[in-house]
Amino acid sequence: MKVVRLHGAGDLRLHTEPDPVPGPGETVVRVRAVALCGSDLHWFSEAGIGGEKIESPLILGHEFSGFIEDRDGGVLRVAVDPAVPCGQCRFCREGHPNLCKTLRFAGHGEDDGALREKIAWPDQCLHSLPDSLNEIEGAMLEPLGVAIHAVDLGSVKLGTKVGVFGCGPIGLLVVQLARLMGAALIIATDKLSHRLEAARAFGATSVFQAENGEESREIWATSGEEGVDVAFEAAGENAAVETAVASACPGATVVLVGIPADERTTFKASTARRKGLTIKLCRRMKNTYPRAIRLVEKGLVDVRSLVTHRFPIDEYRQAFTVAERREGLKVVIEPNQSE
């Protein structure tokens, strides 16, 4: 089978390797679609993420879907949860599997991901796709799950004023969910104009170009000189964190979703302290696939429009180049494109 492995910073190579052999409780999935995530780009450009460094050639890719053959020869299409918690530790037992200390995660550390034609993965992580969802949408359920978890952390309610700082795919999904939750005001910021256009199309009521925090004054005015009740930072940049804190009203919640390249998140402490802000950090997602599937199936969230570029696995270099340049919204690689 074809496999794309990361050997070091910027060093991706196509290999031919044997098909995977499933272990106990695993099934072989023929990978249909892999959406490239910002964390994949961290691995690609920095050979690591969040303190983790590549130690041996790694297969990236954790936002994916595919199909399996059932015992009767039929085909079952599945979205695949990349996270495999132990299920036994304190955090798993208390309902926080995303915080499991021995959690396995596709395309991270020692666990190879989905940029290959086939992957053996635990049955518990396979979610059947309804007929109304295609495999591209199936791959997008993972980032939607992260956005759902972020919005859960923010406790967005009817009439809430929301700020979304960073309008990549996660930020744009947060915009859609905030609208769905009944937010009265959704302010979105980003450096890229095509992302701001998408934010407006997905339900943002006001959009502003991100310019070193200067936009916080406009946000303050737009919010009626009150600031936003919930601020979501989804850019992975300190400038966005600073703007989120500056734009939040007293007593607000700030949810940090982005992953900073330099492993540091900073903001003005006095501003956050005097406002009595609650700062929450979003760690991936937890148990969100069933909700994500229902939201897309019922047409309440649009993930299909986020996918702007699709490539076969042989064109992996071009796919990563487009994603790294942020030329579109979401890039998808299709290892079994012809099937």
Residue ranges and their predicted role:
Residues 1-3, 242-246, 286, 290-339:
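C-terminal hydrophobic helical "lid"/dimerization subdomain
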Residues 5-21, 38-69, 79, 97-112:
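N-terminal glycine-rich cofactor-binding segment
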Residues 20-34, 48-93, 125, 130-132:
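Glycine-rich beta-strand-centered segment in the early N-terminal region that forms part
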Residues 37-38, 82-127:
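Cysteine-cluster motifs in flexible loop/terminal segments that predominantly coordinate metals
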Residues 77, 124, 133-213, 217:
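Mid-domain Rossmann-like dinucleotide-binding core that forms the NAD(H)/NADP(H) cofactor-binding site
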Residues 154, 197, 202-278, 317:
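Glycine-rich cofactor phosphate-binding loops and adjacent beta1-alpha1 units
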Residues 189, 257, 282:
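The conserved SAM/SAH-binding core of class I Rossmann-like methyltransferase domains
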Residues 191-192, 260, 285:
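Residues in the short beta-alpha loop(s) of Rossmann-like NAD(P)-binding domains
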